[in-house]
Amino acid sequence: MEIRRRPPNPKVRVAHLEYAVPHDDEEPRHILEKIVWEKDREIDAARDKVPLDNLKQQIAKLPPTKDFLGALQAAATKPAVIAEVKKASPSKGVIREDFDPVAIAKAYASGGASCLSVLTDKTFFQGGFDVLVEVRQAVDLPLLCKEFVLSPYQLFQARAAGADAVLLIAAILSDQDLRYLNKAAAALGLTVLVEVHDATEMDRVLSIGGFPLIGINNRDLTSFETDLATTERLLVDFNDRLKQQGVLLVSESGLFSRADLDRVQAAGAGAVLVGEALMRQQDVEAGLVQLIQAG
């Protein structure tokens, strides 16, 4: 899938005036492209508001990051669970009306999650870096910043907010971007979870190398439908290369029951990322315990 990083004819702002020459192809072609275009604008605005040097000063005062990958590898129950703090999504709208990220994070920690994932996109997922800060202050588990990362600046934002790991989405990044952002994340002590959706992206990531944690998103990026067979197919096709590189595989999206977890674990997934299934539970902790202990 091709993702154009910016509209072909972006608007230009001079003083209080904004203008652009009309263009037939200036609308995003699908939701992911729409998110990426908006994210580019958000990054520019964030840089103006909080300069990079300010983030570096905040980071200098923080303790070392927690071992996200190590926590997954050491999980007492398999597959290890990354539980997601998620209020909404573009495909489902608001998932949890009574969204209390601190209470949810504490429930996940008590329920046996190995790590947590926190959505930081405001526009489409109603998350935020402020949510990540709140969760960091509430729990000791390793935290993944779930964001549409396009710029190294966002890695500094994630680290300053308390993240231990960051998501890199292969579909929206070039090979050069993936290499550079992986190195930049490592320099900040951040673990990278690189996400793929199909065989082309998996081949790219494995060819680049240096990614011990790879996520397979079972959601089709154009239809937003989920299919756990995506994890099964990619693990069959790339099993040897994944083993050679010592990759821990995370299955993401479409996981709602212990049977789903057992299915992707049988295929070779060492961890799962579960969000919506838990967010819709009246008792989040009990829902997670049931999901983990049923195995």
From Swiss-Prot:
It comes from the Bacteria. PROSITE patterns: IGPS. Pfam families: IGPS. It catalyses: 1-(2-carboxyphenylamino)-1-deoxy-D-ribulose 5-phosphate + H(+) = (1S,2R)-1-C-(indol-3-yl)glycerol 3-phosphate + CO2 + H2O. Keywords: Amino-acid biosynthesis, Aromatic amino acid biosynthesis, Decarboxylase, Lyase, Tryptophan biosynthesis. Its EC number is 4.1.1.48. GO terms for molecular function: indole-3-glycerol-phosphate synthase activity; phosphoribosylanthranilate isomerase activity. The keyword Lyase applies. InterPro entries: Aldolase_TIM, Indole-3-glycerol_P_synth, Indole-3-glycerol_P_synth_dom, Indole-3-GlycerolPSynthase_CS, RibuloseP-bd_barrel. HAMAP family: IGPS_B. NCBIfam families: PRK00278.1-4, PRK00278.2-4. Belongs to the TrpC family. This is Indole-3-glycerol phosphate synthase. The gene is trpC.
